Amino acid sequence: MRVSRYFGTDGIRGRVGQGLISADFVLRLGNALGRVLAQGRDTRPMVLIGKDTRISGYMFESALEAGLVAAGADVQLIGPMPTPAIAFLTNTLRADAGVVISASHNPHDDNGIKFFSAMGEKLDDATEAAIEAAIEAPFLTVDSEYLGKVKRTRDAIGRYIEFSKASVPRGFTLRGLKLVLDCAHGATYHIAPMLFRELGAELVTIGVDPDGLNINAGVGSTHLETLAATVRESGADLGIAFDGDGDRVLMTDAQGRTVDGDDLLYVLARAWRASGRLKGTVVGTLMSNYGLEQALGTLGIPFIRARVGDRYVHQALVESGGVLGGEASGHLLCLDRATTGDGIVSALQVLEVLRHEGLTLSQALLGLHKVPQKTVNVCWSGPARAAVEMPEVRQALVEAQAAVQGRGRVFLRPSGTEPVVRITVEADDVVLMQQTLDRLADVVRDAA
């Protein structure tokens, strides 16, 4: 596996104004991307830039734009749009690359940069390595007659809404359904309500008033409390929550109970198997609940686990010929409908199943029995990867795995996007799970 100097599991991310997430670095990053794209061609490359709603997006949009134009690349500014929309638009507008300025589910004082290839897919390792090498080279400003040009795309919202609606059958409608949408004050705030209303749903909306600072603040897929309460109070059929950049989706049923990515994978896999739509292997991650694996096995559906991160789920799907995969966090990939994780498209796939089968969300989950699972994040001041190499942590991990052997699983991994170590324990007994988790977390905290 390539060791990256700048890129994490989902692009480049950090605190605004510090390290890599500074205007001067992003200027160089844009210049590096432009130079890589220009290699071996006579025409100017074209790059799309989109962003979520955090206030620092204006600063980084300008920095990227300047770096790209200096390198001789044309730029199309999309403005606030979901990450998967930029993936789609990069492909359909025949751009050479797409860039998203977002830190996903993180608070407003974080930001990041994600890239897409001309096909609307995450960059491969070789392209990332070429960009990293170009960052280290001197800044390039081409001669004036070769500078890039910038324009703003005006019809992006309509294009993406029609793309999303095309992911379900033409006769599909949400008439008669009452939904609560939580858009996290993020990139879906203006698109998701419009789309779901066009399909006929009665809507209650929360998280649709971004001010640049409130993205993911107590709302969205990482804060489902408000969504759950609103579903219960309004008598809605279910709730749908997106994260700040719209590539994740979680739900709540009519009683306000959380329905995570593992649950949604089960709903889709079961229905698609019955309809013949499911191809190849369903892909989860090392964090996917053991109960999901058991339930799919009962249905005769093959299931494999990839490393944590939607890019690794995507890679495993391509290698296994599959079309459905995802993570408990809500990154779902429906590769027969979209090239990357798309919260809106994934939500529509689930709703299409429920409408077709005439089931409520809770009824669609009756065949899935997950084992108790819990994850804690332990802050780590230095490189989080160092945690798993410390002798006392490794010994504690061995002991934890022995404690749940035959009854569950234990995972300890550094986050690819935050300065934390994630510890997950699952076991068929909730007391055993909690005791094992507490002991291991205490050792990691002491080591930190």
Curated annotation (Swiss-Prot):
Gene Ontology molecular-function annotations: magnesium ion binding; phosphoglucosamine mutase activity; phosphomannomutase activity
Function: Catalyzes the conversion of glucosamine-6-phosphate to glucosamine-1-phosphate.
Chemical reaction(s) catalysed: alpha-D-glucosamine 1-phosphate = D-glucosamine 6-phosphate
Gene3D superfamilies attached to this UniProt entry: Alpha-D-Glucose-1,6-Bisphosphate, subunit A, domain 3 (3.40.120.10), Alpha-D-phosphohexomutase, C-terminal domain (3.30.310.50)
Any one annotated GO CC term: cytosol
InterPro entries found in the cross-reference section: A-D-PHexomutase_a/b/a-I, A-D-PHexomutase_a/b/a-I/II/III, A-D-PHexomutase_a/b/a-II, A-D-PHexomutase_a/b/a-III, A-D-PHexomutase_C, A-D-PHexomutase_C_sf, A-D-PHexomutase_CS, Alpha-D-phosphohexomutase_SF
NCBIfam families: glmM, PRK10887.1
Catalytic residue positions: 104 (phosphoserine intermediate)
Residues annotated as binding Mg(2+): 104, 243, 245, 247
Family assignment from sequence similarity: Belongs to the phosphohexose mutase family.
Protein name as annotated: Phosphoglucosamine mutase
Phosphoserine: modified positions: 104
Entry comment on modification after translation: Activated by phosphorylation.
Any Pfam family matching the protein: PGM_PMM_I
Cofactor(s) it depends on: Mg(2+)
UniProt keywords, alphabetically: Isomerase, Magnesium, Metal-binding, Phosphoprotein
Stored PROSITE patterns: PGM_PMM
One annotated GO biological process: UDP-N-acetylglucosamine biosynthetic process
Cofactor note: Binds 1 Mg(2+) ion per subunit.
EC numbers for this chain: 5.4.2.10
